[in-house]
Amino acid sequence: DGKRSDIVTVAWTGTICTNPPMLYISLRPSRYSYDIIKKSREFVINLTNEKLAKTADECGVKSGRDIDKWKVMKIEQLPSKVVAAPSVKESPVCIECKVENILELGSHHMFIAKVVAVNVDGKYMDEKNKFDLTKADMVVYNHGEYIGLSKVLGTFGYSVKKKKTRK
């Protein structure tokens, strides 16, 4: 709302459209950040790496009603390019979003949003200007565990690629 911001750890998120680029987050209405996002109609998804995993966990178990997470956890704010909501400076990728729709689904409400800007820390880009997951040490949350994603297992289509034959 321009006056307050919070950091909330979100387990339910994902891409829902490529063109236009859209994604979603799902939050319980009881969460402190819920009303902030509902009123401002914007948010930033700050992707988490191994360096931020403990901070992300702490942001998920402590409420912004009780503490200013930015100050207590010494997280540096980075002004976003398009939205008023700040980005996390330490995050390798910050995705700025504007809410298009809110679906009240039950325990969680889904914020469907258009991506309006993406900010990537240049040190994680490869020589082809592609984001390098193996350099960024990205983390996902799965059923109570934080799991590192620094290993490439294959490329698109590798399961059906024909093996080269020697002549």
Regions found by a protein language model. Name each.
Residues 1-167:
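Basic, polyanion-binding surface patches
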